[in-house]
Amino acid sequence: MAPAVFTSDYWKKYFSNKKKPTVKNTSDIDLLHINRGRQPFDEGLSINEDSFFYRHNIHVPRIVYLIIVACGSFIITGGIEFAIAYGMYKKTETSVRLWRLPDTLSGDAAVTNFVQAIVTYWVESILVQGDLRSGLVKPIYFGWWPENFLLREVLRAKPRYHFKFIVFRWMEWLVFVGLRGLVWSVPLWFLFWPATVGILCAPGRHEGNDYYFNNYPAPQVFKLIFGGGEGFVLTPWIAFLHMYMYGHYLHVAKNQKSLPKTSDLEQQRGTSSSQPSENDANITALPKPEPKMYENSDLTPARTPVTPAPLEKPVNLAPEVVEPTNAAASPLQLNAPKLTDVDDSALAYDPTKVQDGEDRFVHNDVPLENAENPSRFVHSDAPIDMTHTTTVISEAQNLPSTLLPQDGNAVHHDTDAPSLSNVRKSVDSPRVPPSFSDDAVSSFSLVTAPSINNVGGSTAPSVNNQEREYDYDDTSSRSSTLTERPVVH
């Protein structure tokens, strides 16, 4: 089985930022450390805020880390450069010279400077970011970030990927990191190359305008020292840059919640007197909203409570009441006929004798149980616990749905009941007391149900404060109560 380094999953965590913790994705990084059971970035190393190391972000573990990185790079880079020089100069036929081609040490040092800077940036970018994610070293934050666009791009830790395919993303990353390594190779060249050329003039054999060296071991030792020296300086510098970039991104991520979340300029008007935010002096803090706007303000006129003017005449919202001629009648009595002149005990409903224009109340001795159509009576299996019920009946429609049988209200209406028009025509005027005029009666149509609180053997209910008896058989009285509901026109 191939080692893990040759698998694509091993390299995806370095070259792909998809579903992986990155420098800017601090939440995923913290979650990763929590899952591993370790403190991220080793925050517990320095807890004394007054110490020199804490105030200047200089921790001994960081210094030790940079020294280890520098020494390791010196050994590795120096060994690689020694091997390259051995293969280049050991078996050459001509002497190695300082300036002239083909075997020139000055040209070799210049090329080594640029190539080594690019390769070192590639390798250290992977290793240092891995150490920062694992918590091996803590990032550094100095509270300053460059405003120059070029410097901000050079200090960018991750590229802006434009492709999804992993191979293209590798290429983007290589170009991105290589350009930054090339940028840092320029100051490195001014630091190392002139001094190196001046030092090489001392051991060389001067002939004419050039200096000559043996094929071995002078060129190999020169490359070892030159490459190792550059690695000793450049590698910890690259590690420090990544620690600095990581610290800045982490600081921004921690303070994102305290920044204003709105960019509406209309809400920032009149905020010149407000203090700037502690995290960013360029962002103007929004004014704090008052708990109650315009309350107790001198600019706002006092609100005068509006009192409605008293009415000249009281408005009577009650239905129209027709006063009977009898002075002893109750003033609250509605325009319903008073059946006082008729023997109530002899009243029974005989549908066979009801015709158009005839009286529906007849005097006969037919018991209620022999009535063929008792649909004009309200059948209730239980006492109706109501004191007064008034329902308006319309001529154009049947009884409303509220009067149909409901749960807990045993009021039943038979669908075979006579039509309202026939019933209205069947009411005979002689049955109505002379105190009610035709105009007054026809203008108000009500159905009034009396209050029924007891069933069977109890006192008969009253209609319009008068006693009323009904014809019913013994069987129906034991099981239910039949109440006539007169229709008034």
UniProtKB/Swiss-Prot annotation:
Please give the GO cellular component terms listed in this UniProt entry: endoplasmic reticulum; endoplasmic reticulum membrane
Q: What Pfam families does the entry give?
A: DUF2456 (PF10445)
Q: What is the membrane topology here?
A: Multi-pass membrane protein
* Residues modified to Phosphoserine: 27, 263
Going by the entry's taxonomy, the superkingdom of the source organism is recorded as Eukaryota
Q: Which UniProt keywords apply?
A: Endoplasmic reticulum, Membrane, Phosphoprotein, Transmembrane, Transmembrane helix
Is ATP-binding one of the keywords? no
Residues bearing Phosphothreonine are 26
In which residue ranges is the amino acid composition biased (Low complexity)? 477-489
Where does the record say this protein resides? Endoplasmic reticulum membrane
Principal place of residence: endoplasmic reticulum
- Which residue ranges have biased composition labelled Polar residues? 268-282, 450-465
- Region Disordered: start and end of each range? 260-312, 401-435, 450-489
Protein's name in the database: Uncharacterized protein C594.02c
The residues that cross the membrane are 63-83, 182-202, 221-241
